[in-house]
A protein has these predicted regions:
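Structural alpha/beta surface segment adjacent to cysteine/selenocysteine redox centers
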Residues: 75-88
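Short cysteine/histidine-rich metal-coordination sites, predominantly Zn2+-binding motifs
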Residues: 53-57, 112-114
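Conserved strand-to-helix beginnings and helix N-cap segments that scaffold or border functional pockets
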Residues: 42-45, 75-76, 106, 110
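N-terminal leader/targeting and pre-domain segments
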Residues: 1-27, 119
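Local sequence-structure signature of Cys/Sec-based thiol-disulfide redox active-site neighborhoods
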Residues: 19-55
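Thiol-based oxidoreductase modules, predominantly thioredoxin-like and allied folds used
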Residues: 33, 58-75
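Non-catalytic, surface beta->alpha helical segment in thiol-disulfide oxidoreductase systems
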Residues: 85-87, 92-119
Length: 119
C-alpha cells in the first residue's frame, strides 16, 4: 500500500521537525512554504505543481504545505529550528531524516525539483 502523497504537519515547529525527519526516513519530503497573496509564491507553486505532475505513483515523494500567513508560527519556527533563513516562497527538501537542500523565490523551478529528485 502506498502512503498518501500529502502529509499534515503539527502546528508546533519542533513536533513538525520531528515528523519531517521521521517521514523522510524512507521517502523524500518537500515542505512548500507559500503566501496566498504573493505573485512570486503563485509562480513558484505553479512550477512545483508542474513538477508534481511528472511523478508517478511509485515515486516516494511526500509533500507538506505551509501557508506562511495562516501558519506563521510554524513557518518561522520550522526554519529557525533548522537554522535556515525564513523565505516565502521556500522549499525545504528532506531526505534520510535530514534537510538535504532548501531554496526560494526564482530558484523554485520544475527543473530544480527534477534535479533534486535525481530524475
Amino acid at each position: 500500500m502506498t502512503q498518501p502523497r500529502e502529509i499534515t504537519l503539527p502546528a508546533d515547529p519542533e513536533a513538525a521537525l520531528s515528523a519531517l525527519r521521521e517521514a523522510s526516513a524512507d521517502a523524500h519530503v518537500v515542505v512548500f512554504k507559500k503566501s496566498p497573496i504573493c505573485p512570486t509564491s503563485t509562480r513558484a507553486e505553479f512550477e512545483f505543481k508542474q513538477w508534481l505532475k511528472t511523478l508517478d505513483g511509485a515515486d516516494p515523494v511526500r509533500i507538506a504545505w505551509i501557508d506562511v500567513i495562516a501558519e506563521r508560527p510554524l513557518a518561522r519556527g520550522l526554519t529557525a529550528a533548522l537554522e535556515v533563513e525564513h523565505q516565502s516562497p521556500q522549499a525545504l527538501w528532506f531526505t534520510g531524516g535530514d534537510l538535504a537542500w532548501h531554496d526560494s523565490h526564482g530558484a523554485l523551478t520544475c527543473a530544480r525539483f527534477t534535479e533534486a529528485n535525481g530524475s
